[in-house]
């Protein structure tokens, strides 16, 4: 993800990205959000949902701070590893990971023209972005 978009997430959700400045020996978040810009909106919505949920819970009882351990792409899908997430947070993350399979990682388009690249590194791309990257593509 571009530094500009990544920094928007860091600024808006500092608690989720609290380990971003830790060394590699302590956290994989030192690599940042290792995904394409097309998933920014999905990540932003996920972060806001988690923040809202944690705020609601925190009013009822003190809970450990939820934080991201790693945000990356793996086998064409968003992968997020979370610490201190309850069942609801884990379900939110699972939903976002599933949705990423229908959103172009490069441009963010959603829907019918989004598929997987073929050959080499598998990515979720729309037909147009796959063509620009000279990648094979299948629905």
Language-model segment annotations:
Residues 1, 132-139:
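Short intrinsically disordered terminal tails
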Residues 1-90:
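Long, charged N-terminal interaction/targeting segments
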Residues 50, 72, 79, 98, ...:
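Catalytic-core loop-and-flanking beta/alpha module that positions acidic residues
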Residues 104-107, 126:
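Short cysteine-rich clusters marking metal-coordination/redox-active sites
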Residues 54-58, 62, 101-105, 134:
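Residue-level signal for secondary-structure boundary elements
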Residues 120-132:
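Cysteine-rich micro-motifs
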Residues 109-115, 131-134:
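Short functional micro-motifs and their immediate structural scaffolds
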Residues 72, 90-102, 114-120:
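Short, flexible, mixed-charge glycine/proline-rich loop motifs
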């Amino acid at each position: 993800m571009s530094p500009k978009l990544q920094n928007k997430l860091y600024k808006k959700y500092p608690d989720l990205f609290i380990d971003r400045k830790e060394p590699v020996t302590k956290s994989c978040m030192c690599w940042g959000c290792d995904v394409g810009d097309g998933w920014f909106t999905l990540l932003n919505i996920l972060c806001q949902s988690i923040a809202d949920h944690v705020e609601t819970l925190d009013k009822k009882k003190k809970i450990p701070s939820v934080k991201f351990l790693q945000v990356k792409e793996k086998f064409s899908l968003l992968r997020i590893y979370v610490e201190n997430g309850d069942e609801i947070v884990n379900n939110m993350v699972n939903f976002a990971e599933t949705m990423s399979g229908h959103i172009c990682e490069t441009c963010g388009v959603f829907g019918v023209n989004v598929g997987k690249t073929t050959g080499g590194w598998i990515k979720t791309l729309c037909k147009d972005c796959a063509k620009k990257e000279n990648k094979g593509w299948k629905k």
